């Protein structure tokens, strides 16, 4: 797909405003030449002031050019989104809320209720933030804010998914250490994405995946205390999230770009991973009843 961004998008009112400030000619589609006032008795001082004013006006035009181009690029990207972008997460958000309420209400202990509530809340936040960002038509500034929230929510869901499994299956130092690693890593990841919003995918996608596999360090503890089925669901959910991260990073496969592209494949895998973890947490929770 080719996205053509024009440079001649100034409105008549903007051009009139530039000419009112002394711009009379056009070069390459933008008004660049200026009339310089006679310095008169002020001599060189007046000429310097005129040059400074002209430079300021040229800078203003350049800023407006950049804003125009960014706006046009953003609009083109919005138009190029697959038609199903965001709908999977939009549909999953209310389902995750209902499923979370059921899980919390059936949890027999305060620890299981806490873990289930954190898991459900982080999932609802992620799916809601993702759907809001992808389904709306936002200004570039608003889209940047929503993107930060969306990416931060991924870290929260990783830590939120660890929490109930850790509270249910681990104890002692292993429980404390894994919770600190999960939530400390999530906090660091959120700070990283908020500060470096333009980081390339190949930089931040492995960070998500690495944090998602911290549990491997505690594999013996999970197998020692947890039913095999529960640990299998934990691992399967992690694999699905990992496959989703790989698809997101590589932008492949991209089956139907106009309807269901690589990003929709990524979203589908995240929904499947959430459902898998939900089943694992449910099995572990109901086993305590």
List the predicted regions and their residue ranges.
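Multi-pass alpha-helical transmembrane bundles in non-GPCR membrane proteins
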Residues: 14, 18, 23, 28-289
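Compositionally biased, low-complexity segments
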Residues: 5-7, 29
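Aromatic (phenylalanine/tyrosine) cluster motif
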Residues: 7-10, 23
């Amino acid at each position: 797909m080719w996205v053509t961004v024009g440079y001649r998008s100034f409105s008549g009112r903007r051009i009139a405003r530039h000419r009112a400030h002394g711009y009379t000619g056009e070069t390459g589609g933008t008004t660049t030449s200026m009339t310089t006032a006679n310095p008169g008795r002020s001599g060189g001082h007046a000429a310097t002031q005129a040059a400074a004013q002209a430079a300021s006006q040229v800078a203003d035009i350049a800023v407006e050019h950049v804003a125009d181009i960014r706006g046009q690029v953003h609009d083109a990207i919005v138009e190029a989104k697959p038609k199903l972008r965001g709908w999977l997460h939009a549909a999953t958000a209310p389902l995750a809320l209902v499923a979370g309420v059921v899980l919390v209400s059936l949890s027999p202990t305060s620890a299981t209720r806490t873990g289930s509530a954190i898991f459900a809340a982080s999932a609802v936040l992620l799916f809601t933030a993702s759907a809001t960002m992808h389904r709306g038509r936002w200004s570039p500034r608003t889209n940047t804010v929503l993107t930060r929230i969306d990416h931060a929510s991924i870290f929260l869901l990783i830590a939120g998914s660890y929490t109930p499994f850790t509270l249910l299956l681990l104890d002692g130092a292993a429980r404390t250490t894994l919770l600190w690693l999960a939530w400390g890593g999530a906090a660091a990841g959120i700070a990283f994405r908020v500060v470096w919003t333009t980081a390339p995918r190949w930089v931040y996608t492995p960070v998500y995946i690495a944090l998602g596999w911290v549990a491997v360090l505690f594999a013996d503890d999970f197998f020692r205390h947890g039913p095999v089925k529960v640990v299998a669901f934990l691992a399967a959910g992690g694999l699905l999230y990992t496959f989703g991260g790989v698809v997101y990073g590589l932008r492949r496969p991209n089956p139907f770009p106009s309807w269901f592209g690589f990003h929709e494949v990524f979203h589908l895998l995240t929904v499947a991973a959430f459902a898998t973890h939900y089943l694992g947490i449910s099995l572990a929770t109901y086993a305590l009843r």
